[in-house]
UniProtKB/Swiss-Prot annotation:
Compartments (UniProt record): Endoplasmic reticulum membrane; Golgi apparatus membrane
Biological processes, Gene Ontology terms: tail-anchored membrane protein insertion into ER membrane; vesicle-mediated transport
Keywords from the UniProt entry: Coiled coil, Endoplasmic reticulum, ER-Golgi transport, Golgi apparatus, Membrane, Transmembrane, Transmembrane helix, Transport
Lineage start: Eukaryota, Fungi, Dikarya, Ascomycota, Saccharomycotina
Gene3D superfamilies referenced in this protein's UniProt entry, alphabetically: Helix hairpin bin
Molecular function terms, GO-annotated: protein-membrane adaptor activity
Pfam families, alphabetized: CHD5
Source organism of the structure: Scheffersomyces stipitis (strain ATCC 58785 / CBS 6054 / NBRC 10063 / NRRL Y-11545) (Yeast)
Protein's recorded name: Golgi to ER traffic protein 1
Amino acid sequence: MGILAALDLHPYTLVVSSFTVLLIQQLVGFIGKSTIQEFAWLFYLRVGGKLGLSNSFVAHTKKQEELHKLNREKRSISAQDEYAKWTKLNRQAEKLTAEVKSLSDDIAKDKSKINSLVGVVLLFLTTLPLWVFRLWFRKSVLFYLPTGVFPYYVERVLAIPFFASGSVGLTVWMFAVNNVISSVLFLLTFPFKPSVPIPIRQTKVEEVVPESAESKESSPEVIDIADAN
């Protein structure tokens, strides 16, 4: 707490810092945490291979290539005609399969560590700074509104939670910035979203009865007297 108090951040610094953190938070939510973790994993594989950090992945790739080559060779011979050779290849394939599985488990553990690291970094970038701002700088006035710009009741709302009328604190500023950034992202991405089909209004279809059928049903039955006699 002494370190934070010693900083004594200027209101302008708080405005810019909170805006930056909220922008990063909105971008992370827009892109998706899982997508960022996947990009970080691919970056780790690309850079880690050159720096010797992702040895498990490199070894896994080589072992898989050897296993595919061995399986092709095993399928190319007959187990009955060349039983000894086929048995030897089969033992090698089983050994390589076990090694590939072990390396796959190591890669899964490495990926889990990368995902956890990305989660911690995102936490420090997007969540902890906001809590620090709310706890230690909640009583800081960021700026003052010119007199008469807004009605009195609007100034009182903007002064929430406990500032004088005409003041704007961190709570209202962060709420406004969050909504503005969210609206801007929506407007920028809305044209690229898939179009929604126009709903078709369902109309009641009445059954049309032919006129001949109507006349037959409505006309009385005529009995031929001559035929009856």
